[in-house]
Curated annotation (Swiss-Prot):
The modification N6-succinyllysine is found at K90, K100, K158, K162, K199. The gene is ATP5PO. The modification N6-acetyllysine is found at K54, K60, K70, K73, K100, K158, K162, K172, K176, K192. A motif (SIFI-degron) lies at residues 5-23. Residues 1-23 form a transit peptide. GO terms for biological process: proton motive force-driven mitochondrial ATP synthesis. Belongs to the ATPase delta chain family. This is ATP synthase peripheral stalk subunit OSCP, mitochondrial. It comes from Bos taurus.
Length: 213
């Protein structure tokens, strides 16, 4: 039964991918492969949107969908398992029409509703955003400090971080404040992770002292 369910989902996603583009068109592969249900839907959407040169438009529309689904009234209705699927489909159809979403985004939302996959919508949106980030050559970087950085220090930090990038890559920096690290900073850029926090240094010193004693 599980195999049949997966097969059925794959077929429905393929149908969605070709429903708004010419039949038998070659699938456009996204720049990064994401597995799972969200990956299947996001890949189909990326392929269809790429062929119509509407990747950026669909990305903006999906962000709007995410905002709408966070509204208490909408979330209570659409994510409630006791609300009939037909009611959810009608509600979403009205919403996409009101927002004037493209057929690409509207078809995706309707398909998720019809398949009872609305709870997967945030994950699908996240997967598509990841694909778009890689498409733009963005390299995610998170810097955590104990206190806010001044402009001069932040500018210097950006210069250093950009020196690690390859040609065509774009730094996507997020700065977080976490007083618990006590000082220094923690940097995560791409797959690299460097912990230069005072907290970690103190912990290492503490372990070293215990070994000596």
């Amino acid at each position: 039964m599980a195999a049949l369910a997966v097969s059925g989902l794959s077929q429905q996603v393929r149908c969605f991918s070709t429903s708004v583009v010419r039949p038998f068109a070659k699938l456009v592969r996204p720049p990064v492969q994401i597995y799972g249900i969200e990956g299947r839907y996001a890949t189909a959407l990326y392929s269809a949107a790429s062929k119509q040169n509407k990747l950026e438009q669909v990305e903006k529309e999906l962000l709007r969908v995410g905002q709408i689904l966070k509204e208490p009234k909408m979330a209570a209705s659409l994510l409630n398992p006791y609300v009939k699927r037909s009611v959810k489909v009608k509600s979403l159809s009205d919403m996409t029409a009101k927002e004037k979403f493209s057929p690409l985004t509207s078809n995706l939302i309707n398909l998720l509703a019809e398949n009872g996959r609305l709870t997967n919508t945030p994950a699908v949106i996240s997967a598509f955003s990841t694909m778009m980030s890689v498409h733009r050559g963005e390299v995610p970087c998170t810097v955590t400090t104990a206190s806010a950085l001044d402009e001069a220090t932040l500018t210097e930090l950006k210069t250093v971080l950009k020196s690690f990038l390859s040609k065509g890559q774009v730094l996507k920096l997020e700065v977080k404040i976490d007083p618990s690290i006590m000082g220094g900073m923690i940097v995560r850029i791409g797959e690299k992770y460097v912990d230069m926090s005072a907290k970690t240094k103190i912990q290492k010193l503490s372990r070293a002292m215990r070994e000596i004693l």
